[in-house]
Amino acid sequence: MAGPQSFTPPSVTPSRTKKRFTLAEANKSLPYVSRIVKDLVTINRTIATQQQKIEKKAGKDRGSSEKELVISKDRLQSLVEELSAVGAELKDPRSGLIDFIGRHKGHDVCLCWRLGEEKVSFFHEMESGVAGRQPVTGLDESD
């Protein structure tokens, strides 16, 4: 049997009117952001496990488990909102992948960070996603 699947909170699709970060600002926010993301990844795993347990239970035996699941989903949603309030965008709740909106050669890009990385080391074009990650050594923040 495969491991727990992830739960995708409804608000992971960001609006593009978020705060813009310089690379330095994004890195400065990481101590706080990483704590949020660590909790988010953990609660996401918990939700996946809870969902699997509920699927295996019959009718009335599901009651308390479903209540626990609702509480966990509410906690996850509040963590997503907390992350969003900072200006970071959740991309993958399983790996803790997030983006900050930054600038490169006069246009918006995503400064890309994943839980466990010491600093923001990559960026990518808005539509290319993580597959298009490039080292920040090539980032030109001037307009």
Where are these regions (language model features)?
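Glycine-rich, aromatic-bearing surface loops/beta-hairpins
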Residues: 85, 89-143
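Long, non-globular targeting/processing and low-complexity regions
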Residues: 2-11, 81, 115-116, 120, ...
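Short amphipathic alpha-helical coiled-coil/interface segments
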Residues: 68-83
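Heptad-repeat coiled-coil alpha-helices
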Residues: 49, 53-56, 60-63, 85, ...
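Long, hydrophobic N-terminal alpha-helical segment
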Residues: 1-57
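Charged/polar positions within long, soluble alpha-helices
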Residues: 45, 52, 81-88, 116
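Short acidic/polar alpha-helix capping motifs at helix-coil junctions
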Residues: 43-46, 60-63, 72-75
